[in-house]
Amino acid sequence: MPHRKKKPFIENKKAVTFHLVHRSQRDPLAADETAPQRVLLPADKADTEKRKEEQRDFGVFFDDDYNYLQHLKERGPSELIPSATSKSKSCIITDQDGDKEKEPQHVPGPSINLPSSVFASEFEEDVGLLNKAAPVRGLCLDLDPDIVAALDEDFDFDDPENQLDDDFILQANSDDLRRSSHEKDDDDDDWEDVESGSEENDYDSDGTVSDEDDGEGDGARKEFLFMQEETKSRFTEYSMTSSVIRRNEQLTLLDERFEKFYEQFDDDEIGALDNTELEGFIDSNSGRLEEVINDYYKQKAKDCVKLKNLTPRDGMDSVTEEDDEDKEDMQTIVIEEPREKWDCESILSTYSNLYNHPQIIKDPPKAKLIRVSVKTGIPMDVLPGRGLTAKQVERMEMINSSDIPRVSTHPRKDESKEERKARKQAIKEERKERRVEKKSNKLAFKEEKSRQVKEQLNLKQNLQGLKLS
C-alpha cells in the first residue's frame, strides 16, 4: 500500500491559541460561584518585531508588549461594516447550452464550539469587585453624627442626656409622650377633632360608620376625617406587609417622624441642572421648537428699550452714566524701587584684592583654667617639680642593669628536643623575673606617692601658720 500522509490533528496555520487567565475583577460574573473563575484569552499571532517596526514608523518607541496600533485608524470617510458575514460561497456552473449560473456553496462551520462561559464577559463594570468591598475612608456624611462620634470614640457617654433610662420602652409607650408629640406636631391644623357622639362624623379606623355612643365628656375619643388626611408620602419603597397593616397610633407617629425627617432634605427651588447633556433628534418644523424660539424672542423684546419710548433726557442720562463709569475706572500701578546698578569699575573691584582682603575669621582660644589641688588647695603646676633623689637614681640604675634580652618564643625549624626544652625553661625564668620586677616597681611608686602627699600636707600647714606683719 502506498504511504499516505496523515492529516494533522491541529493545523498550526488555522489554529487559535488561548491563554488561561483569571477573570477580571470588573467582570460581572466574578462574584458568580457557578461561573468559572478562569477564562480563555486569545493569543496574538502578530509578529512582535514586525509590530514594533510598524510602531516606530508612527512615532511609538515604547519597549513593551502592548499593541499601540489598535488605537490608530486610517483617515477617510466612514464606511459601514456588516455585523455578520455569510458563511456560504458561490460557485459558477456552466450548462451544456453555455449558460452560466451561480449556485451557493455551503462551507462547513467550525468543528468545535466553545461555550460563552469560558470567555470573559463582553461588558465590564466601571468599578472592580475589590474596590467595591474596600473600606470607606474619610467623612461619612450619610451617617448619623452620633453614630460617627461613637465609632470614633468621641461620644460623651458620661453626659446624662446621652444615657437611656432602664424603663425607656415604657416611657416611649406612655400616653404623656404620645400627647406631647401630637401637640408639637406642626401639621395639627390639617386635622379636625370630631366628637365621638356626633352622628355625622363618627367613623372608626376602618372607615365604617359607628352607631354606638362610646362616651361623652372627658373620656370622648377624638378621630380624624380620612378625606382630610394627607396621604402623600416621600417614601416609595413600602413592603407588601406595610401596605395592608392597619396603621395604629404608634405606626402613625413613626410615619410622621419619618416625614418630618425627610422634609429637611426637600429642595425649595429646583432649577436647571448643571452640565446637562441632552441627546436625541427633533424636527426643524416641530411645534415645540417654534414655541421655544417664540418664547426666546418675547423675552428679548421685554429686556430691550424701544426707540419710540426713548426720550432725549433718557439718552443724556445714559451718556452721562457712561462718562461717570469711565471716570470712576481706576487702575492700580505698582511702582518698584530702582535696583542698585553697578558700573564696570565697581564690579571689577570685587574681584581684586586691592581693597578687598578676604580672610578667615579665627575663633580666639579659651583661657586656660587654673586647677586647684583638692588635698592641698594650692594651684597645680605652679611649684617647680623636684628631681630624683640619690636613692631613686640608684634604684633606676639597678633596674636598667638587670634588663636581659628577651628569649624568642618562636621555635626554629632545625630545633632539637634539648634546645626546645632549654628555650622553654628560659622563657619561664624570664617571665618570673618580670613578675618580681613589676611587683617591686609597684611598691616603689606607692611609697613615693605617700611620701609626696605627706610633704604637701606639711607645706600646707606651714603656709597657713605664716603671719604677715
Curated annotation (Swiss-Prot):
What ranges does the record list as Basic and acidic residues composition bias?
44-53, 175-184, 411-453
Q: Which GO terms describe its biological process?
A: ribosomal small subunit biogenesis; ribosomal small subunit export from nucleus; ribosome biogenesis
Ranges of Acidic residues compositional bias? 185-217
- Residue stretches in coiled coil: 412-467
Name the source's superkingdom.
Eukaryota
Gene Ontology cellular component terms for the protein in this record? cytosol; nucleus; preribosome, small subunit precursor
- Composition bias (Polar residues) maps to 83-93
Going by the UniProt record, its keywords in alphabetical order are: Coiled coil, Ribosome biogenesis
Segments traversing the membrane? none
Q: Where is this region: Disordered?
A: 24-53, 77-113, 175-220, 399-453
Function as written in the Swiss-Prot or TrEMBL entry? Essential for ribosome biogenesis.
Protein family (similarity comment):
Belongs to the LTV1 family.
Q: Which PANTHER family match?
A: LOW-TEMPERATURE VIABILITY PROTEIN LTV1-RELATED, PROTEIN LTV1 HOMOLOG
Q: What is this protein called?
A: Protein LTV1 homolog
